[in-house]
Amino acid sequence: MSKKNIRIQVIIECTEHKNSGLSGTSRYVTTKNKKNNPERLELKKYNSILNRKTIHKEIK
C-alpha cells in the first residue's frame, strides 16, 4: 500500500504588488509539506513587474 501524499501544491502571490495598484499579478506555484508547515507559506521571491525581491504569501 502506498502512503498518503503530504506534499501539496500551493500558489504564492506578491503582497506588495497587490497593494500598489499596478496591473497584473506576480504568482508562483510551489509545493509544501503539510505536516512540517501547517501554517501559510511566506517566501521572498523575485517580482518581475516591480524588478525586485518581494514577500509572497500563500493564497487559498
From Swiss-Prot:
Keywords: Ribonucleoprotein, Ribosomal protein
GO molecular function: structural constituent of ribosome
Superkingdom field: Bacteria
InterPro entries, A to Z: Ribosomal_bL33 (IPR001705), Ribosomal_bL33_sf (IPR038584), Ribosomal_zn-bd (IPR011332)
One example of a Gene Ontology biological process annotation: translation
GO cellular component, one term: ribosome
Ribosomal protein as UniProt keyword: yes
HAMAP family named in the record: Ribosomal_bL33
Family in the record: Belongs to the bacterial ribosomal protein bL33 family.
Name listed for the protein in its UniProt record: Large ribosomal subunit protein bL33
Organism classification: Bacteria, Pseudomonadati, Bacteroidota, Flavobacteriia, Flavobacteriales
